From Swiss-Prot:
Keywords, ordered alphabetically: Hydrolase, Multifunctional enzyme, Purine biosynthesis, Transferase
UniProt comment concerning the protein's domains: The IMP cyclohydrolase activity resides in the N-terminal region.
PROSITE patterns with a match to the protein in the record: MGS
Record gene name: purH
Cellular component aspect of the GO annotation: cytosol
Coiled-coil positions: none
GO molecular function, a single term: phosphoribosylaminoimidazolecarboxamide formyltransferase activity
Organism: Chlorobium limicola (strain DSM 245 / NBRC 103803 / 6330)
InterPro entries: AICAR_Tfase_dup_dom_sf, Cytidine_deaminase-like, MGS-like_dom, MGS-like_dom_sf, PurH-like
Residue pairs linked by disulfide bridges in the UniProt entry: none
Entry EC no(s): 2.1.2.3, 3.5.4.10
Listed pathway(s): Purine metabolism; IMP biosynthesis via de novo pathway; 5-formamido-1-(5-phospho-D-ribosyl)imidazole-4-carboxamide from 5-amino-1-(5-phospho-D-ribosyl)imidazole-4-carboxamide (10-formyl THF route): step 1/1; Purine metabolism; IMP biosynthesis via de novo pathway; IMP from 5-formamido-1-(5-phospho-D-ribosyl)imidazole-4-carboxamide: step 1/1
Record protein name field: Bifunctional purine biosynthesis protein PurH
Length: 525
């Protein structure tokens, strides 16, 4: 069978990128173009010859455009097998002309439901019905019909048509058909996921079944290590669509790596804890915070965060909860950093920071999506859990010691607790004056984490006398608390829940420590 020459095309797109030039070329190749609604107007306004789909169907677009292509003369023209004599006969008897090309992309459902203020009505109106129907009909009949959903394919198709006397190759039609079914499958999963969330049904535990759609958004140079392939995928589930581009824009620097993406997630998840609060700075290395501070100015917050660990920030990631100003930019510019993330960059700051070509500058355009599910792959399946997004307020704290914490201690305890859950377990964190003084992360023994945190503080001459300590899980024995008391701690925040809580409380009282229980553990693995 020879490749069919394209004589008639149906064009209806929501994304009009390149469509005028593409259709102009089709017209020059002798293709008759039919279109709908806004696409038809766009083509006609640009001087491209195109007729309304109604000239094929003999029926107007009705119900606010909900019904325009759902017609036998459309789908018969797409699905007819050209080598089947009965199909050809029935087409002639019913006045059905063959349609050789479909150019359709769908209503932007995923982009619509990703908007924080989207209404249910807006979401429903952006569920495309006619588009997927035409795409599936055309893709099913890919022996005869060329179907395009992506403007990136326009050039290849035009090239083949010029070289092939108006026809595309079988290999290209098959490739394009595969893209259609991948698109419609993802589109339907996104709708199902949104409606699942919109239903508002209370589910005890994780749902028995989940529908998750992944679409590659960014290529990664490599994975965690150079021998590993990797990519970044936008995710759509029952909570909506989540993508890098919705939250961030890379303004400068090399392409982002797999490890960069992990660090961006870690840094911004932590800086979100301080949204709307005093100027705050988070410095992250290998997804662990190595310095966090709040102050009256951003530059002072940076200097204090940096002073927690003056080595780890080199090659690290820094996130700010305020627009990055010139004073802070000058201070940061003194060291090599992989990535700087801010909600805005004040005048002149980008000019200064862009002088270092290897540094990535990332604009955080909006807050991170709240809640949702967290997925972790294992060699034997997928773990799914709610994100650790619950907030502990001051009124949730239970004072378990004889001494109540002072206002200053309470402020530092709450500051420490916000940070603690973002550090790899086991975690011991020393805080003083709204600044991390010692970070003990990722140790198998809680006592070892405490020793490391104390050692890190001593390395940079930070005095732990008068500090507070946070532990991501309960102290199983009093030894960890006694080590903190020996370091000069005056107050403690921890979940509680150990069978030896009374022993730990007695040790706190014996050392005149104030201790509060949160009732919430924050393991992080």
């Amino acid at each position: 069978m020879s490749d069919p020459v394209i004589k008639r095309a149906l064009v209806s797109v929501s994304d009009k990128t390149g469509i005028v030039d593409f259709c102009r070329e089709l017209s020059l190749l002798g293709v008759e173009i039919f279109s709908t609604g806004g696409t038809l107007k766009t083509l006609q306004d640009a001087g491209v010859a195109a007729a309304s789909i109604s000239t094929i169907t003999g029926f107007p677009e009705i119900m606010d455009g909900r019904v325009k292509t759902l017609h036998p003369k459309i789908h018969g023209g797409l699905l007819a097998v050209r080598e089947n004599a009965d199909h050809v006969k029935q087409a002639l008897e019913n006045g059905i002309g063959f349609i050789d090309m479909v150019v359709v992309n769908l209503y932007p459902f995923e982009a619509t439901v990703a908007k924080p203020d989207v209404t249910f009505e807006d979401a429903i109106e952006n569920i495309d019905i006619g588009g997927p129907s035409m795409l599936r009909s055309a893709a099913k009949n890919n022996e005869s019909v060329t179907v395009l959903t992506d403007s990136a394919d326009y050039a290849q198709v035009l090239g083949e048509m010029r070289a092939g006397a108006g026809a595309t190759t079988r290999a290209t039609r098959l490739m394009l058909a595969r893209k259609v079914f991948a698109l419609t499958s993802r589109y339907d999963r996104a709708i199902a996921a949104y409606l699942t969330g919109a239903a508002g049904a209370e589910v005890e535990g994780a749902a028995a079944g989940m529908t998750v759609s992944l679409e590659k958004e960014l290529d990664m140079r490599y994975g965690e290590n150079p021998h590993q392939n990797a990519g970044f995928y936008r995710l759509t589930d029952s909570e909506g669509s989540r993508s890098f581009g919705a939250c961030f824009e890379k303004l400068h620097g090399k392409e982002l790596s797999y490890n960069n993406m992990l660090d961006i997630a870690a840094a911004t998840s932590l800086i979100e804890e301080f949204r709307g609060e005093d100027p705050s700075v988070v410095i992250v290395k290998h997804t662990n915070p190595c310095g966090v501070a709040q102050a009256d100015t951003l530059v002072e917050a940076y200097r204090r965060a940096f002073s927690t660990d003056t080595q780890a920030p080199f090659g690290g990631i820094i996130a700010f909860n305020r627009p990055l100003d010139m004073d802070t930019a000058v201070a940061v510019n003194g060291i090599f950093t992989e990535i700087l993330i801010a909600p805005a960059f004040e005048d002149g700051v980008l000019d200064l920071l862009m002088k270092k070509k290897d540094r990535r500058l990332v604009l955080q355009k909006q807050p991170l999506p709240k809640g949702g599910w967290e997925f972790k792959s294992t060699p034997f399946g997928m773990l799914v859990q709610e994100r650790d997004a619950r907030i502990v307020a001051v009124e949730d704290l239970k004072v378990v010691t004889k001494r109540q914490p002072t206002e200053e201690e309470l402020s530092n305890l709450m500051f420490a607790w916000k940070i603690c859950k973002h550090i790899k377990s086991n975690t011991i964190l020393y805080v003083k004056n709204r600044q991390t003084y010692g970070v003990g992360a990722g140790q198998m023994s809680r006592v070892d984490s405490s020793k490391i945190a104390r050692w890190k503080a001593s390395e940079v001459n930070l005095d732990l006398n008068g500090s507070v300590v946070a532990s991501d899980a309960f102290f199983p024995f009093a030894d960890g608390l006694l080590a903190a008391a020996e370091a000069g701690v005056t107050a403690v925040i921890q979940p509680g829940g150990s069978i030896r809580d009374n022993e730990v409380i007695e040790a706190a009282d014996a050392n005149n420590l104030a201790m509060v229980f949160t009732g919430m553990r924050h393991f992080k693995h």
